[in-house]
Design a protein with these regions (language model features):
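P-loop NTP-binding core
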Residues: 1-313
């Protein structure tokens, strides 16, 4: 069974989507792992980064190709979804003219913006409250059902969550073994981490109770906290600058040393230069104008990937 990980932060601009893509790339190249990416955010940023905006538009709009929207459309229509037909294989760009053969992706769609309201309105009447609870669990299990269908094909599944706790995000949590919080070392990025953990503890408790009450086989397995990984860290003299170092230390003091990745990703123009070409920063040899910074960021990102493997087990 794959390790399923939700990437979440309620604060935008922390590099969550970039981190998700690079974890997949690093897991594939550094650790020879098979990875499935799922873009749950209606902004579609992971989809754009992974295959390129023009390729995405051609696939999702010009050709009306499958996206996550089709999965939920089938749920509302009480129709089955064949997971293999939704996943794009050998489309995630590795470098100029090359793709990752071990990374698949389920693309997002902008119409997912309205999905949460539609899910909230979806009510199925049961013979009793227990059966209605089963129906509520089905609503939370749409993503999990897709993952379970292709579980033997992947070692990791990474879910890029929107910055909220709506029913789409709850679908991701329900399916996940872990959740990881990308952050930048500033107050606004880190202030909500305790609240995220509080909500996750509550979700775990609620889901456990629902599962038991519905009389489903087995037990619900909690989604565990995988850690906080810092991104866009300014360095000086071989370590974080004072302001960023203090914020990282403050987070460690509040959350515990084991809650924070020992490795981080530095700030620089390498990742942004790579993103403009729809490439991961690991393709730094294709980025002559930002080669030095890109190579440095690639090395730091690689260390984060290696630590991720030791944490998510």
């Amino acid at each position: 069974m794959p390790q399923v990980v939700s990437m979440i932060n309620w604060k935008g601009g922390v590099g969550k989507t970039t981190m998700t893509l690079h974890l997949a790339a690093g897991l594939a190249t550094r650790h020879n792992k098979r990875v499935l990416l799922i873009d749950l955010d209606a902004q579609c940023n992971l989809s754009f980064l992974a295959i390129g905006a023009s390729s995405y538009i051609t696939h999702a709009y010009n050709k009306n190709g499958p996206t996550l929207k089709n999965v939920f459309d089938n749920y509302f229509a009480h129709a089955p979804t064949i997971a293999a037909n939704i996943i794009l294989q050998k489309q995630v760009r590795a470098r100029a003219g090359k793709i990752y053969t071990q990374v698949g992706i389920i693309l997002s769609h902008q119409e997912l913006t309205l999905l949460d309201m539609k899910l909230a309105r979806e009510k199925r009447s049961g013979r009793d409250h227990r059966e209605e609870t089963k129906f509520e669990i089905e609503k939370l299990s749409v993503i999990k059902a897709i993952i379970d269908e292709v579980a033997s094909d992947y070692d990791y599944v990474l879910l890029d969550c929107p910055p909220n706790v709506n029913l789409v995000t709850q679908n991701a949590f329900f399916a996940s073994d872990y959740y990881v919080v990308p952050a930048i070392p500033d107050f606004l990025s880190t202030v909500g981490i305790s609240l995220i953990k509080k909500y996750m503890d509550q979700f775990n408790s609620d889901y456990t109770s629902m599962w038991s009450y519905a009389g489903l086989p087995g037990t619900y397995v909690d989604t565990k906290f995988g850690g906080i990984v810092f991104n866009m860290v300014d360095e000086y003299g071989g370590g974080p600058k004072d302001g960023h170092r203090q914020m990282i230390q403050s987070t460690i003091s509040q959350q515990g040393k084991s809650s924070v990745f020992a490795n981080y990703v530095t700030d620089g123009d390498g990742i942004s230069a790579a993103a403009q070409m729809n490439l991961p920063v690991f393709a730094y040899s294709d980025l002559p104008r930002a080669h030095q910074n890109a190579e440095k960021q690639a090395n730091y990102m690689g260390q984060v990937v290696d630590e991720f493997v030791t944490r998510i087990i």
